């Protein structure tokens, strides 16, 4: 029922679908999705802190801390 309701709803699905790509491209923009994606990338990529510094994000320090923990494995 939920899936059918979402499909029948035109405005809600469109907004959700449009929000997903926005979060993916949030790396270049300062949005609430940025820190979440940053932590995810920091665990898989060590360069996450680099693009965070280039974008001039205020939470760049958080990216570095989480990145170091992910590299050492102490976070796990």
Swiss-Prot record:
It comes from the Viruses. Product of an upstream open reading frame of the genome polyprotein gene. The initiator methionine is coded by an unusual start codon TTG. Plays a role in viral replication. This is uORF2 protein. The lineage of its organism: Viruses, Riboviria, Orthornavirae, Kitrinoviricota, Flasuviricetes.
């Amino acid at each position: 029922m939920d899936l059918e309701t979402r499909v029948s709803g035109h405005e809600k699905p469109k907004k959700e679908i449009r929000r997903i790509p926005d979060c993916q491209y949030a790396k270049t923009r300062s949005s609430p999705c940025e820190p979440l994606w940053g932590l995810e990338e920091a665990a898989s990529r060590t360069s996450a802190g680099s693009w965070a510094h280039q974008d001039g994000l205020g939470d760049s320090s958080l990216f570095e801390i989480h990145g170091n923990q992910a590299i050492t494995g102490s976070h796990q």
